[in-house]
Amino acid sequence: MEDNIDKDGPKGHASRSTRKSSRARVSVIGAGYVGLVTGLCLAESGFEVVCIESIRERVSALNSSTVPFHEDGLGTLLRSNLRSKRFIASNDMRSIKRTDMTLVCVGTPSRPDGSLDTKEVLSAASQIGRIIRDKPDYHVVAVKSTVPPGTLESKVIPLIERESGKKHGEDGFGAASNPEFLREGNAVHDFLHPDRIVIGTRVRKAFAELSDLYAPIDAPMIKVTPPAAEMIKLASNAFLAAKVSLINEIGNVCKELGIDVREVAEGIGMDRRIGPDFLRAGCGFGGSCFPKDVKGLAEVARRNGVEPLMLDSIIEVNEGQPLRMVELLERHMKINGAKIGILGLAFKPGTDDVREAPSLRIAKELLRKGAKVYVHDFQAMDGFRRQVPKVITCGSPEDCVRLSDAILVLTEWPGYADPSLYGDKLVIDGRGVTRTKEYDGVCW
């Protein structure tokens, strides 16, 4: 493996790219939230993009202008870039050979011990290596998937070298860690207007080509080593998750003292050292990133002889928050035999994603305690019902309220804010969405 750190600037040097994009042909492996947003935003920037996906039904849907999940703005991008022929979906990995670079955007789910499962990343690396073996031109591989620090250099690059017969460096192929920082529900905006672009590589040519790729985007670019880039992603999510768990724990104390934590959050958020973001106390965080990445980083720490006391506490606090909603409900009424409505199933508004959502744990606990559970969400009911089939889905918030003895509000969709929706029903609010006659908040 060649060590070709760019001598033009120090490690960690941040700059704004002034290079003119050469409009490379790009292949993206994976058409999930990250891969599809990445592919379509690059196509919108003028690149020719092929998005490679193993699920044939998803490929057919995409090429028929159908987005397989909810993400604001994605449908418009898909339709316009299919028309312009800058974007196409395929299940043929050999499409990589006709492109200049490949972005790996496959999932790295949690294993039972909390570690990140990188088998899909390594499978992609092996296939890339075999496909570029006979390709005469230079090829860049950028891993956007979240992986443990050291994965690119210890596993991905050796696999590509072995399968391709090429040497990593300035001649055969170049590799980089290029983590994403997209928020579901705001992913298109976040890709086109990022706070920073992180490129972790030791190869000058790979950095230059990735700089060209991001030239249309006006954002600071930081060049670091691959392990540092991999750690930046995990550490960023750990910091944000820590802020959420800390305000939730403070909120739990405030609740018992009769203090509204929202007033406390406003006051501490005005401190520029703290800032107002991620200070909304509630029933806990969910999604595909925070829980997985904090657990993954904790396991990296353990495997390297560091006891992750704070990382473990972030998860412990978060896993307790949904159950506080149930405990709060029990202060007001007997759950066994009651009809309980849940408004909001997605882990946040603007998405249909229910992965690690507080609603999952709450619904299962209510069912275990003998409640009949009615649910509504503006986007996430199908995905939720697949995981918790015993709930009863409602076609509107009004139906859910009408059929229920009490309501738990778990996602801050604007459609749940009107107090008149609830009448005289008891409302347990986990997100600070509304304020009704019979009302209690999880942290206020």
What are these regions (language model features)?
Residues 2-444:
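Structural/interface elements that position substrates and couple domains in central-metabolism enzymes
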